[in-house]
Amino acid sequence: MARPKIERRICGRAAHHCFKPNGVPFHQLEQVAILPEELEALRLADLEGLSQQQAADQMGISRQTFGNTVKSARFKVAKSLVEGHALVFPNEESNL
């Protein structure tokens, strides 16, 4: 049986639904979904400049979990930028 996922504290949401390369129709692009907790981890680490421990405390998760989350988010952003994919920000009601 899988361990239950600890609820993360998330203070905001993305300003837009997605970011994509200019001039390419959305339906022609591969989509890379970044989860709300991944976006929050990026915000805390890269925008706010918090240490991993400070950011983990603010999200209510362990430092190790925070590190894994921000690593996953950075990979998805880099993949989208380098390979020209659409980066989408699904909300809790989405099925992505």
From Swiss-Prot:
Pfam family, one: DUF134
InterPro entries, alphabetized: RNA_pol_sigma_r3/r4-like (IPR013324), UPF0251 (IPR002852), WH-like_DNA-bd_sf (IPR036388)
Coiled coil spans: none
SUPFAM superfamilies per UniProt: Sigma3 and sigma4 domains of RNA polymerase sigma factors
Gene3D superfamilies according to UniProt: Winged helix-like DNA-binding domain superfamily/Winged helix DNA-binding domain
Family in the record: Belongs to the UPF0251 family.
Protein name: UPF0251 protein VPA0321
